């Protein structure tokens, strides 16, 4: 939304929207990450399980939907500047990258702010996974599965947005 708001009306290149886009990308995985909080659901004596489930699911789905809506905005903004095939390729990549971010948050306990507060340790951890991929099968399993899930959800929502609903009278 900020990119749309502050973009230059002229045809000249402006760095500002791309900086905003970089910050958006840094925090985007937090939206689908909330789904992994469902792993913490346990039966408790004083609180009904259905209450915890409905509360957590409502927050997780709301976060996911707002995240995917923000991606729709980024998609539309990029399509005005880049070839459609390139934007589709980038969107698929962003969603798999988000799967990797979800893995880093859920299993390695890193978060977006660690890029500023502890960048070397975070970059070392990321580099280790790329330099020694066979030593980290869980990394790639979670990344691929979450990437597939996020891509499935995003492209379903995008196809609904693109196709008008026809009613018959």
Predicted regions and their residues:
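Hydrophobic alpha-helical membrane-insertion segments
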Residues: 21-26, 90-109
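Interfacial helix-loop-helix junctions of multi-pass membrane proteins
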Residues: 38-39, 104-118
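Transmembrane alpha-helix boundary signature
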Residues: 2-9, 31-42
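Hydrophobic alpha-helical transmembrane segments
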Residues: 56-65, 129-150
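Short, membrane-exposed interhelical loops at transmembrane-helix boundaries
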Residues: 114-136
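Transmembrane alpha-helical segments in integral membrane proteins
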Residues: 65-77, 143-167
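Alpha-helical transmembrane segments and their immediate interhelical/interface regions
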Residues: 47-79
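Membrane-interface helix-boundary motifs at transmembrane edges
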Residues: 4-16, 76-86
């Amino acid at each position: 939304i900020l990119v749309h708001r502050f973009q230059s009306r002229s045809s000249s290149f402006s760095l500002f929207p791309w900086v905003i886009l970089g910050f958006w990308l840094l925090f985007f995985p937090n939206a689908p990450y909330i789904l992994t909080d469902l792993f913490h659901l346990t039966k408790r004596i004083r609180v009904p399980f259905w209450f915890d489930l409905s509360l957590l699911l409502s927050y997780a789905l709301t976060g996911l939907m707002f995240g995917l809506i923000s991606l729709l905005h980024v998609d539309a903004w990029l399509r005005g500047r880049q070839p459609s095939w390139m934007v589709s390729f980038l969107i698929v990549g962003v969603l798999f990258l988000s799967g990797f971010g979800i893995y880093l948050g859920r299993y390695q306990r890193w978060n977006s702010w660690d890029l500023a507060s502890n960048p070397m340790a975070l970059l070392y951890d990321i580099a280790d996974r790329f330099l020694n991929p066979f030593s980290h099968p869980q990394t790639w399993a979670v990344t691929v599965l979450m990437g597939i899930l996020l891509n499935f959800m995003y492209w379903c929502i995008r196809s609904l947005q693109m196709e008008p609903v026809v009613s018959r009278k």
